[in-house]
Amino acid sequence: MGWREKFDVLREKVKADEKFWGYCDLHNPASVTFIQAVQEKYPFVSEEYLDFLRNTDGCTLNIWFFMGSGAPHFIPEWVFDPSGCRCPALFGEAQALSESLPKWRNVAELGLYLPIGRDGCAETYFLMLEDGQILEIDCETKKTSWDRIIANSFGELLDNVIIGEKYYTLGCDDPGDWSPYNENDWTRFLNEQGWWVH
């Protein structure tokens, strides 16, 4: 099962359990105009990422925000702080990184890149590189020694890492490092679906 089919399952889960929205907020598709703008500014962007935008204009999956246009989207009334639930705007995040990254790293070594996601604290970012690989960088420690290729493609990032069998790699170096302390409704749901068994 790929990420598109998993998204269908996740949408049904949120319909059946409104509180799960806190772990999974999938939006309406991005506008054609926005998708075209992404293609024009980042011609190397993968078709799979564009297909993601056609499926959802950014999203939240557990603690991970994936960039979209930044357009307003549905937020349930029970959410205490709606401002903390808005997915970051891709072009805004790209501009901010273009100003902050050169202060602590050699951006020429990165080559062309597109920020596609980050954690809720804006400490860890996922960058799509020109070859399609996904680089995880640490903007909190500002140490390039923490850089790592976390997936070979955007689809692999979603399928195998965020909602798949390598989810543990986001917080642990080894599956054996995982502990009950790391459990939440998101990880339990991944287990129930058989998408990640530990």
Where are these regions (language model features)?
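Acidic, proline/glycine-rich low-complexity IDRs
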Residues: I162-H198
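Compact, glycine/acidic-enriched structural inserts
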Residues: I137-Y168
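Generic structural signal for short, solvent-exposed loop/turn connectors between secondary structure elements
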Residues: K41-F44, L129-Q133
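Short, surface-exposed beta-strand/loop micro-motifs that present aromatic residues
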Residues: E123-M128
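A surface-exposed partner-binding patch
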Residues: M1-C121, D173, L190-H198
